Amino acid sequence: MSTSSLIVAMDGPSGTGKSSVSRMLARRLGARYLDTGAMYRIATLHVLRKGVDLADPDAIADATVGLPWSIGTDPAGEQVLLDGEDVGEEIRGDAVTKAVSAVSAVPAVRELLVAAQRRLACEAGRIVVEGRDIGTVVLPDADVKIYLTASAEARAQRRNAQNLAEGRGDDFAAVLADVQRRDHLDSTRAVSPLRPADDSVLVDTSELGIDDVIGRLLLVVSERSGVGQ
C-alpha cells in the first residue's frame, strides 16, 4: 500500500469518544476526517423539517431524494450544511438524536449516504472515516479497521457531562436509558446492524483517557498499514 493513501475505518457505538478520537487521529496522520453519523443526522433533520412520519419508511425515503446537503472533511472543525445553512449545532439536538436511528434504518437512506461516503473516502487520499458500519459495509477493504467500545454506563456519564457543559441539565438516568435504547436499535436493525468487522481491532475506552486511546490507535495504524506516526 502506498503511504500517501490510507483509509482508517472507525466504528463503534455512541459515547465511546469516537468523534474526538477520530478527529485527533486524523490530524496526527495528516488525513481528512469524515463523520458519517453527521450525514445521517443531516438527513434526519431534513426529514423532521419536512414533517415526515417517522413510522413511514417510504415517506422518509422520498423526503431524502435530492437531499440538499454538504459536509466537509477538515478534521479541524465540523462543516455541515443543509439548504446552505450551517446546521452543525442543530443536528446534535435532542430531536435529531431521538429520531436518527429510525431514519438511518431506512434502506434507501443508507444506500444514498453509503454511496456518498464511499465517494468522499476514495477522493480523500488519507482519511479517517467514523461511523457504525464502516468496516463491515461502507469500506470493507479499508486499510485499518478499529472498533471503539465502552460500557453503557461510561458512555452515559460522558454524554451527561457534555449535556451539563452545554447547559442541557443533569439527568443521568434518562441519558443511560437513551444509550441503551439506541444500542438495541442499532444492533438489531435489519440493515447494517452495529457490530465489529471480523478483522477489526477492538479498543475499550471505558477507563482510558483520550491521549492513551490516541497512542494505542497510532500503534494499531502503524502495525496494520506501515504508516508511521
UniProtKB/Swiss-Prot annotation:
Keyword Iron: no
Catalytic activity: CMP + ATP = CDP + ADP; dCMP + ATP = dCDP + ADP
Protein name: Cytidylate kinase
UniProt record similarity statement: Belongs to the cytidylate kinase family. Type 1 subfamily.
Keywords: ATP-binding, Cytoplasm, Kinase, Nucleotide-binding, Transferase
Cellular component terms (Gene Ontology): cytosol
Main location: cytoplasm
Xref: InterPro entries: Cytidylate_kin (IPR003136), Cytidylate_kinase_dom (IPR011994), P-loop_NTPase (IPR027417)
Binding site for ATP: 12-20
Subcellular localization(s) per the UniProt record: Cytoplasm
PANTHER family (UniProt xref): CYTIDYLATE KINASE, CYTIDYLATE KINASE/PANTOATE-BETA-ALANINE LIGASE
Gene name of the encoded protein: cmk
HAMAP family, A to Z: Cytidyl_kinase_type1 (MF_00238)
Molecular function in Gene Ontology: ATP binding; CMP kinase activity; dCMP kinase activity
A GO BP entry: pyrimidine nucleotide metabolic process
Enzyme class: transferase
UniProt-listed Enzyme Commission number(s): 2.7.4.25
UniProt xrefs under SUPFAM superfamilies: P-loop containing nucleoside triphosphate hydrolases
Keyword Glycosyltransferase assigned: no
